[in-house]
């Protein structure tokens, strides 16, 4: 029964992709599971998103939610994670931010639930005379941060963190101006699956992250991409780690008002939230402090 349902969905998706000229974009939508393809097609149709932007943002969101739950065995003992560094590129007004926010909305909701739980734990801790272990705030999304605060956030949530910024060039400019490339070195190490160690006078307890998982996603304008070449990122290998997303067409599809726009958008968003909830439900076990036990897939 499930196989028949999936076959029908696959046929429906193919018909929709042909009718909506999805192949003209050159985007390989067929690499996604059929139910995710259906959600992407709905969001593209009813929200007027660029398929390249919404699909890649959703892929990044899954990577952030999955985190270090699974690791990839590349060859022998060589393992890495599913980290993605993504930059959405387009002229002003092309619609980079809305699909990015739509893809990560369930993660923001998850973070908000963690924040409310943290508030309750802090109140209980203070009411108990501040005895016992002080609660820590766990979250996945970070936007405004320093290299040190990023590492502390990741230490509190060893599963993963994602740097999500609307204009990513601002982050790179701040990195070079204030941290002398410290964050870039950490990102290079994390992308390769190496452990991170941070020792600061301001923090008496050193931070050690055995299996870091730091995702990055943000947008930038077409005319600003060249700025990355001026920062030495080509020489240190950062550019080779970035997935650049530039739609083939610089135009936005004509806006069509439909009576069921709101209903269909809500249904697609709810289906997407259920998928990410299932990803978050995957256990990330810690055997001992600073050492995570991960599943490995070839």
Question: At which residue positions do the language-model features occur?
Answer:
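Phosphate-handling catalytic cores of nucleic-acid transaction enzymes
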Residues: 1-295
């Amino acid at each position: 029964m499930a196989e028949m349902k999936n076959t029908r969905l696959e046929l429906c998706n193919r018909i929709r992709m042909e009718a909506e000229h999805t192949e003209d974009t050159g985007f390989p939508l067929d690499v996604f599971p059929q139910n995710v393809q259906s959600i992407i097609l709905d969001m593209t149709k009813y929200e007027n998103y660029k398929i390249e932007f919404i699909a890649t943002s959703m892929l990044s969101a899954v990577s952030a939610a999955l985190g270090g739950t699974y690791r990839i065995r590349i060859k022998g003992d060589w393992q890495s994670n599913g980290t993605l560094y993504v930059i959405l590129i387009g002229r002003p007004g092309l619609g980079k931010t809305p699909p990015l926010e739509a893809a990560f909305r369930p993660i923001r909701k998850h973070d908000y639930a963690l924040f409310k739980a943290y508030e309750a734990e802090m109140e209980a801790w203070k009411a108990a005379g501040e005895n016992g272990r002080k609660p820590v705030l766990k979250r996945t999304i970070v936007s405004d941060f320093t290299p040190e605060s990023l590492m502390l956030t990741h230490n509190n949530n060893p599963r993963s963190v994602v740097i999500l910024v609307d204009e990513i060039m601002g982050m790179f400019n701040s990195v070079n101006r204030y941290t002398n490339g410290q964050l870039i070195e950490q990102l290079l190490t994390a992308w390769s699956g190496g452990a991170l160690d941070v020792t600061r006078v301001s923090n008496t307890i050193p931070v050690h992250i055995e299996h870091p998982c730091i995702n990055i996603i943000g947008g930038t304008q077409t005319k600003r991409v060249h700025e990355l070449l001026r920062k030495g990122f080509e020489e240190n290998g950062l550019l080779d780690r970035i997935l650049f997303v530039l739609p083939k067409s610089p135009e936005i599809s004509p806006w069509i008002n439909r009576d069921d726009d709101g209903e269909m958008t809500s249904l697609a968003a709810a289906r997407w939230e259920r998928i990410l909830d299932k990803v978050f439900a995957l256990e990330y076990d810690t055997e001992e402090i600073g050492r995570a036990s991960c599943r490995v897939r070839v």
